[in-house]
Design a protein with these regions (language model features):
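Ferredoxin-type iron-sulfur electron-transfer modules in oxidoreductases and energy-metabolism complexes
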Residues: 33-46, 91-236
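Short strand-turn-strand beta-turns centered on an Asx-Gly dipeptide
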Residues: 28, 68-71
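Short structural boundary motif marking the start of a folded domain
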Residues: 2-7
Length: 236
């Protein structure tokens, strides 16, 4: 049966607005079992086509529609409207510059991601086929490779808010450990050297916001803890 959805949406167009404001929007949906992105798509198509947001896969895979939903970061496409208290308050991801409405500038986030060398480094002779792993070695990557780089975790972290140019952030550090833990990679020492800094790694204080908001159920804090353990072991 049809349902009415009430939302309060952060709006800001730098070309015409002096400051941000919250817009009250009401939209009708034909079905009660819908995702938040369905409501936003309906608003953009039928109510206000100036609303700006990122979205793509609608399946929780691309991570592009990450936003702050009722005070908690998440993906609009995997957040069921039935789980949300109305009016639903939507804001852009915190800690990053707002480009327009719910769209943020991800430049700093991806700069930190690229700083950890997010690819295999292996200078040994290339095998005729793939580089093999045992099942146990492969299992070490579970809970790491599934990250979709939506930035929900990093933008929920106070340390990233305060030091986005120095602290790699939960997402970047999770990816750093993903390659450190990979038996095919030969750059562990270099990767640890890259993180040997008062800010890049050790600014994590295990607040656990990153774990709470990850839409894929990953645990960046656990990965960060393992990197810290490796740092301590090589120092003694």
């Amino acid at each position: 049966m049809p349902r009415t959805v009430k939302l309060k949406i952060y709006r800001f167009d730098p070309d015409k607005d002096q400051k941000p404001y919250m817009q009250d929007v009401t939209v009708e949906l034909e079905d009660t079992d819908k995702m938040l992105l369905d409501a936003l798509q309906r608003i953009k198509s039928d109510v206000d086509d100036t609303l700006s947001l990122r979205r793509s896969c609608r399946e929780g895979v691309c991570g592009s529609d990450a936003m702050n939903i009722n005070g908690k970061n998440g993906l609009a496409c995997t957040t069921n409207l039935n789980e949300l208290t109305q009016p639903i308050t939507l804001r852009p991801l915190p800690g990053l510059p707002v480009i327009r409405d719910l769209i943020v500038d991800m430049t700093q986030f991806f700069k930190q991601y690229h700083s950890i060398t997010p690819y295999l480094v292996n200078d040994s002779i290339r095998p005729e086929k793939e580089r093999l792993q045992t099942p146990t070695e492969r299992e070490e990557l579970d809970g790491l490779y599934e990250c979709i780089l939506c930035a929900c975790c990093s933008t929920s972290c106070p340390s990233f808010w305060w030091n986005p140019d120095k602290f790699v952030g939960p997402a970047g550090l999770l990816q750093a450990y993903r390659f450190i833990a990979d038996s095919r990679d030969e750059a562990t020492a270099t990767r640890l050297d890259n993180l040997e800094d008062p800010y890049r790694l050790f600014r994590c204080h295990s607040i656990m916001n990153c774990v709470d908001v990850c839409p894929k159920g990953l645990n960046p804090n656990k990965a960060i803890g393992k990197i810290k353990e490796l740092m301590v072991r090589r120092a003694v």
